[in-house]
Amino acid sequence: MGETIKCTFNLFEEGRQYTGHHRNYILESAIKACYAPETREGIRLREKLGYLGHGRREIARKLQLAEVEPVKLPDGSTIIVENIPSNITTFFEVNKDGIVEHHQEILETGPGKVVSGLNASKVGGFSWACGGQDGGAMGATRIVDFHGFDYVMNPGFAKN
């Protein structure tokens, strides 16, 4: 097994003033998604995978990725993209005060090695991949499901 990175952040304290998404999370929805039976089972079975960046999920237009995904290019052609994870969520909790704690086991894969190096250099951090309704800076953001934590260059929560 690879190294484990333990993170804690507060849903109501982004640690950013000028950058970030400034979302107003509905706490109850985050707690419900965290403790949903499918989330707990996915963590237990080591299926809540994370990737280097959100890009793979974005180009596939879905949060739950297969090992390979067909991706349609602007010219109409299709390519096959391999989705090699960098990390696995092994622990995930959200408490009534909005404190989120999660542990990420870094995988012995190419992307995992990049994540390990970036983290050791204090560049980037983890960002959760959740389905739901994004209210942006002015509305309420509701989480309905959890798919893992990706490693991104500018995480929404600076302490993550």
Where do the PLM segments sit?
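Signature of dsDNA virion morphogenesis modules
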Residues: M1-N160
